[in-house]
């Protein structure tokens, strides 16, 4: 094997030793006294929401006391699991002053609106990725959380994985020199979908579907709209995997370096827009400049972020591992990080943030940075134009009317930001 082709496995990166899982992660640790617990309400407990719900159940200093979901079976199942209350209306959870934090694991178009209601109700939040439906939502989220002084944790669990931590530490510590190029790959989005109207299932009901749509346009129910993966690929409700999965490798990019803050950001490229129902961008291939750093952001069959230094050394971080251009780069790297703040228990990190008043590792500032790149990419594809962003003023530079039109979207009454 050639040295330059060497694949640094986790063992060579210092993470090959057995992983010791705390008993609390398995639900075996004795719960803390009630006075020391952070009370949690779970908003959205289907699919991914159920996974997140269970991760907070496993935290010894947390107590999940209420759940809300539009689907009757989901909220009743989860309420039975945690021994808490089941609500149709998430606002009943937010109105309870005894609840400290909430998880927001709804369809994408509800992420920021519910998070804003929660912040104004003085609840800290776990918010599933992607962040916002528009640039306006993203910026409003940061402003409202700062005003209300509550904690925000993003659903970028890769920050809790040792391989990702080590890779970002290597880049931050200068092991590959000055970063000159970054390659960001994300799984592709979907297309197709059947928009044919059909009866609303009894488990959801007319009121449930109306609440499920919320601020999104009023449209007839169809099964492909509400199925777990389908909702990610409908533009009324999402920007697709540009944000929905792109959030993960883009988050690694901003965690490892600050190129997106170093100068003007320019985004241009190509992509396809599907249909008849799934009409978000797929097959994208974006060319991005972050100051003087070149970034390729493209759809692929994997999740990966590769950092290339000025002398050719590189580090590639992906969900299940870490590669480097040379085994020497990572051979002596231990977990005593000096350039990244890390945790190995994602849900517990939010609980500790609330208990000890500290910022979660997966924080809102970085969520805004990565989500902004996703939105700039979406705007560039949809307008077939180069988009320029000023990261200091946090606004588009000399935007066209078509670009301006995509910065925000109307919300259906009575929902607002």
Walk through the language-model features, giving the residues of each:
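NAD(P)-dependent dehydrogenases' Rossmann-like dinucleotide-binding region
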Residues: 44, 175-193, 208-222, 265-274, ...
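C-terminal segment of N-terminal export signals and the immediately downstream linker at the start
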Residues: 20-60, 64
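Beta-strand-loop-alpha-helix segment that lines the small-molecule cofactor/substrate pocket
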Residues: 107, 112-160, 174, 384
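NAD(P)-binding Rossmann-fold cofactor-contacting core
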Residues: 63-78
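Rossmann-like dinucleotide-binding domain that binds NAD(P)(H)
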Residues: 210-292
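N-terminal secretory signal peptides and thylakoid transit peptides that target proteins
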Residues: 1-14
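Basic phosphate/pyrophosphate-binding loop/patch that engages nucleotide-derived ligands
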Residues: 143-149, 166-180, 200-204
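NAD(P)-dinucleotide binding in Rossmann-like oxidoreductases
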Residues: 272, 276-280, 284-345
């Amino acid at each position: 094997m050639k040295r330059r082709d060497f694949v640094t496995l986790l063992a060579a990166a210092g993470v090959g030793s057995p992983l010791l899982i705390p008993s609390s992660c398995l639900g075996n640790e004795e719960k803390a006294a009630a006075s020391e617990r952070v009370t949690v309400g779970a908003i959205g407990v289907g699919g991914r929401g159920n996974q997140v719900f269970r991760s907070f159940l496993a935290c010894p200093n947390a107590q999940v006391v209420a759940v809300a979901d539009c689907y009757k079976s989901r909220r009743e199942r989860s309420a039975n699991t945690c021994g808490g209350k089941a609500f149709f209306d998430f606002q009943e959870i937010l109105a309870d002053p005894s609840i400290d934090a909430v998880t927001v694991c709804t369809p994408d178009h509800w992420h920021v609106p519910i998070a804003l209601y929660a912040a104004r109700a003085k609840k800290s939040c776990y918010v599933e990725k992607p962040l916002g439906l528009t640039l306006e939502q993203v910026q409003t989220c940061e402003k409202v959380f700062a005003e209300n002084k509550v904690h925000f944790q993003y659903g970028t669990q890769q920050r809790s994985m040792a391989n990702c931590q080590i890779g970002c530490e290597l880049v931050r510590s200068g092991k590959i020199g000055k970063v000159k190029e970054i390659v960001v790959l994300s799984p592709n989005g979907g297309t197709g979908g059947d928009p044919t109207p059909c009866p609303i299932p009894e488990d959801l009901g007319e009121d449930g579907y109306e609440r499920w749509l919320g601020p999104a346009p009023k449209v007839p129910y169809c099964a492909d709209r509400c199925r777990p993966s389908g909702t990610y690929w409908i533009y009324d409700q999402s920007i697709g995997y540009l944000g929905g999965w792109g959030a993960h490798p883009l988050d690694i990019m901003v965690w490892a370096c600050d190129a997106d803050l170093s100068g003007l950001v320019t985004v241009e490229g190509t992509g396809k827009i599907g249909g008849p129902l799934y009409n978000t961008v797929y097959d994208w291939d974006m060319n991005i400049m972050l100051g003087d750093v070149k970034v390729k952001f493209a759809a692929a069959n994997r999740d990966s972020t590769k950092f290339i230094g000025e002398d050719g050394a590189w580090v590639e971080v992906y969900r299940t591992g870490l590669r480097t251009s040379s085994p020497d780069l990572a051979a002596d790297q231990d977990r005593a990080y000096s350039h990244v703040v890390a945790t190995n228990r994602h849900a517990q990190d939010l609980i500790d943030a609330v208990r000890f008043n500290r910022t979660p590792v997966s924080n809102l500032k970085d969520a805004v940075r990565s989500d902004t790149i996703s939105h700039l990419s979406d705007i560039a594809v949809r307008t077939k134009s180069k988009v320029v962003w000023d990261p200091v003023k946090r606004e588009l530079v000399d935007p066209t009317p078509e670009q301006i039109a995509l910065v925000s979207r109307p919300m259906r009454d009575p929902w607002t930001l």
